[in-house]
Regions:
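Structural signature of tandem-repeat unit edges
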Residues: 1, 62-75, 89-105, 115-131, ...
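N-terminal segments that cap or nucleate solenoid repeat domains
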Residues: 12-69, 83, 90, 198-202
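Small/polar residue-rich beta-strand/coil "junction" motifs that cap repeat-based extracellular fibers
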Residues: 53-55, 136, 161-173
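Short beta-strand elements of solenoid repeat domains
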Residues: 85-86, 109-113, 135-139, 165
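Non-membrane alpha-helical segments in proteins
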Residues: 78-85
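Extracellular/surface-exposed low-complexity segments
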Residues: 1-23, 34, 165-202
Length: 202
């Protein structure tokens, strides 16, 4: 029960958290000291550090927009497991350049079932510690383009089962092909990705 080795925080310490707004059905990722200052129509969700479904998963079919605030670039999530899985009405994700993935180990089901997303800019994604990408882009029916940089690597990935399966609109260096849906195609030179440019400051 102290601020140095215990569970308490110093006043003014920043927290990483997510706010679901039930009026505009938006999901906003924040990193600041205002975790207790939310409106009546907003719900604060904590960010899991392991492979557990996120709190906002219960609202997945309602979410239409995701926003990462610039301050979130200072957060260091350990897992993106199920973050946007089966958000079937999600049409836009803003500020993905502010998601620092350098400490993330699991991206399983991260975008699976996002049926309305057409483009993902993952150019700043550092996947050097990721070991699990199962179903990461599974059944993204409208997804045509995924932008990445050379920081998107799969060297440590041991579970890539059905990573791209049924995302048949994908086209990068090659177009999607049935039975070709593992990490082999997670690159922009010979796979389904397109080369992009990282625009965020670490």
């Amino acid at each position: 029960a102290n601020t140095s080795t215990g569970y308490f925080k110093e006043p003014g310490d920043c927290s990483a958290y997510v706010v679901f707004n039930s009026v505009d059905n938006s999901l906003t990722f924040k990193y600041d000291t205002n975790i207790s200052q939310v409106a009546e129509n907003e719900t604060v969700c904590t960010i899991k550090t392991c492979n557990q479904s996120p709190v906002w998963y219960n609202n997945r079919s309602s979410i239409t927009k995701v926003v990462f605030e610039p301050s979130f670039i200072s957060a260091r999530p350990a897992a993106c497991y199920y973050w946007f899985s089966y958000c079937t009405n999600l049409a836009t994700i803003e500020g993905l350049e502010y998601l620092n993935t350098s400490e993330v180990t699991s991206m399983s089901f991260m975008f699976s079932g996002c049926k309305k997303i057409t483009t993902l800019n993952l150019s700043n994604f550092d996947t050097s510690k990721v070991t699990d990408m199962i179903h990461m882009f599974y059944h993204c029916d409208a997804l045509t383009t995924i932008y990445v940089s050379d920081k998107f690597v799969v060297d440590q990935v041991t579970n890539d089962n059905m990573m791209f399966e049924y995302s048949e609109a994908l086209k990068g260096a090659q177009k999607y092909s049935n039975l070709k849906y593992d990490k082999t195609y997670a690159n922009y030179r010979t796979g389904y990705f397109t080369c992009g440019i990282n625009t965020a400051d670490d």
